[in-house]
């Protein structure tokens, strides 16, 4: 089944794009003792099927905006003590949940959300394992105790409505 999400002019144009895992941690990297594992989000465990995920989300009050064979679209989703206006949950070739992206945007350059979430992640996971800042993009990557990952990105993106907005994107994956 497929229920297309309604058009929202401020969604990033790539919110339906493919989900990809960052490069693995460097060979010498080891998680610090006690670092949390990254094994899911919103109470969903990586590997869960899309049907089970939809039931869970509907039954727990999440606003499901649409879904397809390999993605679920959500609105106004809590993550890391913030509300994210849009989120996409991604399901791999085997049908299991393997990643998510949470989006927050402003019409102007504003690093407030990025900096606050960055500081939260540093407090929990330590300094990022990888940082790639350049060409108008800030990108930091952390790994959990099980090599699950978190990325935090800030950049300007085209929106579905054709305008350019500044997005903070928080992604979790397996």
Q: What is each PLM-predicted segment?
A:
Residues 1-21, 30-67, 104-174:
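Non-cytosolic coordination micro-motifs
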């Amino acid at each position: 089944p497929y229920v297309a999400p309604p058009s929202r002019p401020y969604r990033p144009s790539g919110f339906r794009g493919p989900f990809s895992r960052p490069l693995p941690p460097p060979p010498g990297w080891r998680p610090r003792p006690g670092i949390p594992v990254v094994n899911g989000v919103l109470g969903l465990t990586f590997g869960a099927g899309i049907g089970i995920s939809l039931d869970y989300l509907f039954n727990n009050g999440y606003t499901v905006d649409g879904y397809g064979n390999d993605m679920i679209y959500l609105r106004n989703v809590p993550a890391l003590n913030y509300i994210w206006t849009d989120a996409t949950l991604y399901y791999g070739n085997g049908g299991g949940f393997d990643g998510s992206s949470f989006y927050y945007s402003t019409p102007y350059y504003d690093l407030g959300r990025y900096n606050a979430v960055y500081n939260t992640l540093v407090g929990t996971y330590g300094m990022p394992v990888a940082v790639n800042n350049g060409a108008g993009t800030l990108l930091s990557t952390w790994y959990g105790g099980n090599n699950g990952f978190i990325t935090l990105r800030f950049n300007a993106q085209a929106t579905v409505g054709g305008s350019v907005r500044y997005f903070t994107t928080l992604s979790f994956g397996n």
